[in-house]
From Swiss-Prot:
A GO biological-process term: chemotaxis
Keyword hit for Metal-binding: no
GO cellular component entries: cytoplasm
Domain Response regulatory: 5-122
The name this protein goes by in its record: Protein-glutamate methylesterase/protein-glutamine glutaminase 1
Gene, per the UniProt record: cheB1
Organism: Caulobacter vibrioides (strain ATCC 19089 / CIP 103742 / CB 15) (Caulobacter crescentus)
């Protein structure tokens, strides 16, 4: 099998060297070049035709966001963004994911985190090489989304799990959610410093109130709760109503927070009064949990292969019988509301 050809773009020669060395140590990857700024990178993309580009966000002359926008318009290809894990870096990275970057990786902050960060870059480059590239990501919508003004809650809650490609998918879904939407809990695989900014970004585009989940928060209609990244898993529990619970623990299915943990807790807490949704992402996280939800009587949906950036999590769930129906991303928001409506 041919090696994955990678172009590394970073204004720091040290960082280019570190990333390139880590990638070249993997037998499936070949670094074909390194560029110090977007103008140099533009010529190298034309000359070298890489399979994947790793792109620093903060660079001189032209920042990574502007360059990514040009790439996605003129020559769409898999791009992995490399960003500092700061508030400003989070905002820019979320914009990059909206524009069509496959995934983001945090730059190592110190020597102790270098090997872990470099290993993550290698893993995400491999995922990116198999990803479907969206050529119209980040484009302005032709018209404002039509939200369900007649939506009547049935008392069901909605639980959603996503990973690679989930930023665009969740934005697409939640922009259709009205102020009366069912209580919704989300686990999206994302660095800890990004989830608050991500919740705020979703909040600006949705009719619902979207917030980062806090321990003990009461689940209410019209509200969406996003699992904090990093240290805890998000669960739903019964305690004077339905509430969010943040639980410390080891990664489950390779992740913390884990979609499996969320789905299992929803099955236990509400049984058949739920809609479970598994979206684009690599791996198997969420598949077993969604099956548990379906066995408890919940309605379940999976994103279809054609609209996924990475058809991994939904495929795993579908293959074990956890998915009742596969739905395209363009129809997913409406399908969720239909299943959670008192009028169905």
């Amino acid at each position: 099998m041919a090696k994955i050809r990678v172009l590394v773009v970073d204004d720091s020669a040290t960082m280019r060297s570190l990333i390139s060395a880590a990638l070249n140590r993997d037998p499936d990857i070949e670094v074909v070049g390194g560029a110090g700024d977007p103008f140099e990178a533009r010529g190298m993309i034309k000359a070298l035709n890489p399979d994947v580009v790793t792109l620093d966000i903060e660079m001189p002359n032209m920042n990574g966001i502007d360059f990514l926008e040009k790439i996605m318009r003129l020559r769409p290809m898999p791009v992995v963004m490399v960003s500092t894990l700061t508030q400003a870096g989070a905002e820019m990275t979320l914009r990059a994911l909206e524009l069509g970057a496959v995934d983001c990786v945090g730059k190592p902050a110190d020597a102790t985190g270098t090997q872990e960060a470099l290993a993550e870059i290698v893993a995400k480059v491999k995922i990116a090489a198999r990803a479907s590239v969206r050529t119209n990501a980040g484009a302005a919508p032709t018209s404002a989304p039509t939200r369900r003004k007649d939506f009547m809650p049935s008392g069901d809650i909605v639980a959603i799990g996503s990973s690679t490609g989930g930023v665009e998918a969740l934005l697409s879904i939640l922009q259709l959610f009205p102020e009366t939407c069912p209580p919704t809990v989300i686990t999206q695989h994302m660095p800890a410093t990004f989830t608050a900014s991500f919740a705020a970004r979703l909040d600006r585009s949705s009719g619902a109130k979207v917030q980062e989940a806090s321990d003990g928060a009461l689940l209410e209609p019209g509200k969406v709760y996003v699992a904090p990244g990093g240290a805890t898993h998000l669960e739903v529990v019964r305690s004077a109503g339905l509430r969010c619970r943040l639980v410390a623990g080891d990664p489950v299915s390779g992740h913390r927070p884990s979609v499996d943990v969320l789905f299992n807790s929803v099955a236990h807490a509400v049984g058949d009064k739920a809609v479970g949704v598994i979206l684009t992402g690599m791996g198997r996280d969420g598949a077993q949990g969604l099956l548990t939800m379906r066995k408890a009587g919940a309605k379940t949906l999976g994103q279809d292969e054609a609209s996924c950036v990475v058809y991994g999590m939904p495929r795993s769930a579908f293959e074990i019988g956890a998915v009742e129906r596969q739905v395209s991303l363009s129809s997913m928001g409406q399908s969720i509301l239909d299943l959670a409506s008192a009028r169905r």
